[in-house]
């Protein structure tokens, strides 16, 4: 289960020699090993209107994950700087990004199409997930409080300083249960591992083993059956 799109998750997983299906975009899409979508739950027009209103009111830029790649309302240079910081291998402090860092940033940034607003995403594009990064943690808390008034939108975070938004039916835990049910796998036979708030929907009692990583957020450790050392 990943918050990433298939295109972002597959190279990492396959590079480790693992061959499997993928629950992507925080549960909004389930894909076969070769990337064919089996099921998908996009954001509805009502979801999009609420997300646009709340994030725009707060001055928050968006990464918009769609059927046609990622659209971004951030100013291009600002988004690129955030990507550099995310992938920094220590070379930024020396004032000269390493070749490996430049390559990573170029590869990641190539997936983005920059637009002025959510309304500029081409008509007919299916939108699965919207997120934003490097937000003050207290602002994330306030945003989640505002979205709590939208019961058909699920909110999550990989870090305390980001926010991820999907349809309420598109959550990792729900997608994992559906995936297992189709294959006659009982929840009690499943081991779940996670480290952040966006894994919470999988950390429910019916799963046999819920394992929080040693560096997991406290909210996950509080509900996990086990914790790594």
What are these regions (language model features)?
Residues 9-13, 143, 220:
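Hydrophobic packing residues within well-ordered alpha-helices of enzyme cores
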């Amino acid at each position: 289960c990943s918050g990433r799109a298939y295109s972002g998750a597959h190279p990492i997983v396959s590079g480790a020699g693992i061959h499997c299906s993928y629950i992507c975009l925080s549960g909004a899409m389930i894909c076969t090993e070769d990337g064919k979508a089996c099921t998908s739950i996009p954001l509805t027009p009502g979801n999009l209107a609420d997300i646009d209103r709340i994030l725009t009111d707060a001055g928050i830029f968006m990464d918009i994950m769609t059927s046609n790649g990622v659209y971004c309302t951030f100013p291009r240079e600002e988004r690129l700087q955030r990507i550099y910081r995310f992938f920094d291998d220590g070379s930024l402090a020396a004032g000269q990004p390493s070749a490996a860092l430049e390559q990573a940033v170029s590869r990641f940034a190539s997936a983005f199409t920059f637009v002025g607003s959510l309304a500029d995403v081409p008509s007919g594009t299916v939108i699965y997930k919207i997120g934003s990064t490097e937000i003050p943690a207290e602002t994330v808390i306030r945003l989640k409080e505002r979205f709590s008034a939208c019961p058909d939108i699920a909110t999550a975070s990989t870090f305390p300083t980001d926010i991820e938004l999907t349809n309420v039916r598109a959550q990792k835990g729900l997608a994992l249960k559906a995936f297992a049910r189709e294959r006659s796998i009982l929840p009690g036979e499943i081991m779940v591992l996670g480290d952040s708030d966006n894994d919470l929907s999988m950390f429910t009692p019916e799963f046999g083993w819920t394992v929080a990583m040693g560096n997991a957020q406290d909210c996950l450790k509080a509900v996990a059956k086990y914790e790594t050392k």
